[in-house]
Amino acid sequence: MGKFVRGKNTSSWMRAAFCLALILACCAATAVGQSQGLSAQAQAINQNVKEVYFPFNIYNRVIDAKTVDANADWLKQNPDGKLWIQGYADPRGDIVYNLVLSYRRAQWVKAQFVKRGVDASRIEYATGWGKLYQTCQQTDDKCFQQNRRVDTVPPEDLLFHWGQ
């Protein structure tokens, strides 16, 4: 349970997850205005909500559960602002497999936040980017671990960076 097995979990929703990720990337990139910087609220989210890391090939268990708790607590105490939850995978595995795995990670984090009292209406979307946007490019286990993550960010953060 919680482990994604190729072939066993395949269905049309995998294709839908892939298409959704591509559509969101295109829509967000084209909707970018000329932002002058991030709001204080967006900066606070970036400074206080930490990345959540996952074991290899797992979407429903994290390396450090205290990070999920701390993030949820901070978000409850600071209830303003929309959120985007984005899952990622390390570069091993094929594109569709990693998109689905990263999507499930993002959905799991979203569910954990809501379970811990974060208002679900704040979360505009939770999606997976697979092996896109790697934070570490080396091919060792330590680097792979850094890429198996979920980020929680304010929408304007991504729009600001994509507009640069």
Regions from the PLM with identified roles:
Residues A17-C27:
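Bacterial N-terminal signal peptides
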